[in-house]
Swiss-Prot record:
Belongs to the peptidase S1 family. Snake venom subfamily. Its main location: secreted. This is Thrombin-like enzyme calobin-1. One of its GO terms (biological process) is proteolysis. Negative results: does not show lysine esterase and caseinolytic activity. Keywords: Blood coagulation cascade activating toxin, Disulfide bond, Glycoprotein, Hemostasis impairing toxin, Hydrolase, Protease, Secreted, Serine protease, Signal, Toxin, Zymogen. Pfam families: Trypsin. The active site is at residues 67, 112, 208. One of its GO terms (cellular component) is secretory granule. One of its GO terms (molecular function) is serine-type endopeptidase activity. Disulfide bonds join 31-165, 52-68, 100-260, 144-214, 176-193, 204-229. It is an enzyme of class 3 (hydrolase).
Length: 262
């Protein structure tokens, strides 16, 4: 019964962030149009609603969160304003999707990562360019950049037309573990913890899958957090990109049987 209760609580917290998949960065400002050439938007093919973000890591591959998986979606690149398109915007659909286990087996602290191969390569342009994978792991205390088209109010369904950006801090993992004792999060994890302890700045619904950029390097993928967002002493968790480098690079090289770190 205890296990069932824990699993139920984990599902609730997973859903709370997945449901935030249409929210924007809270406490931020409009991103400079030239600072997010790698940022992609995942759209529902039927409703045309933006539900997640992602990061272009080369001309043919996008990295996002596993919980952003949907049956039918499109990937828009080179987008800034949802209402006023850039001339160099491009749209792709997934050709292949790769998960550490499967889209249904990720956990709050592990394997919330999805690697997408596009149906055709994109070309670099004024508003499109990939972001390199990290060369070293991040350090606690680093200043990190978050961005996305997610909700800009922690409690209201307020969505921006353009992506918002904010700076937050990389924190000790325990700062994400301590606020949620009921979830039994492990003592160590392949996730990063980032936020502002006094609250006010955070990723939120719709920012899932987007990048966490620390000291200029792509270090994390927005995974989960509290709802309402941006609450004091409740930072958010990000899948640690550096720990998955071997898996990512193996898949891109053609070794589709590669396994994620244990």
């Amino acid at each position: 019964m205890v296990l069932i209760s824990v699993l139920a609580n984990l599902l609730i917290l997973q859903l709370s962030y997945a449901q935030k998949s249409s929210e924007l960065v809270i406490g931020g400002d409009e991103c400079n149009i030239n600072e997010h050439r790698f940022l992609v938007a995942l759209y529902n093919s039927r409703s045309r609603t933006l539900f997640c973000g992602g990061t272009l890591i080369n001309q043919e591959w996008v990295l996002t969160a596993a919980h952003c998986e949907r049956k039918n979606f499109r990937i828009k690149l080179g987008i800034h304003s949802k209402k006023v398109p850039n001339e160099d915007e491009q749209t792709r659909v997934p050709k292949e999707k790769f998960f550490c286990l499967s889209s249904k087996n990720y956990t709050l602290w592990d394997k919330d990562i999805m690697l997408i191969r596009l149906d055709s390569p994109v070309s670099n342009s004024e508003h499109i360019a990939p972001l390199s994978l990290p060369s070293s792991p991040p350090s606690v205390g680093s200043v990190c950049r978050i961005m996305g088209w997610g909700r800009i109010s922690p409690t209201k369904e307020t969505y921006p037309d353009v992506p918002h950006c904010a700076n937050i801090n990389l924190l000790e993992y325990e700062m994400c573990r301590a606020p949620y004792p009921e979830f039994g999060l492990p003592a160590t994890s392949r996730t990063l913890c980032a936020g502002i302890l006094e609250g006010g700045k955070d990723t939120c619904r719709g920012d899932s899958g987007g990048p966490l950029i620390c000291n200029g390097q792509f270090q994390g993928i927005a995974s989960w957090g509290d709802d309402p967002c941006a609450q004091p002493h409740k930072p958010a968790a990000y899948t640690k990109v550096f720990d998955h480098l071997d898996w990512i690079q193996s898949i891109i090289a053609g070794n589709t049987d590669a396994s994620c770190p244990p």
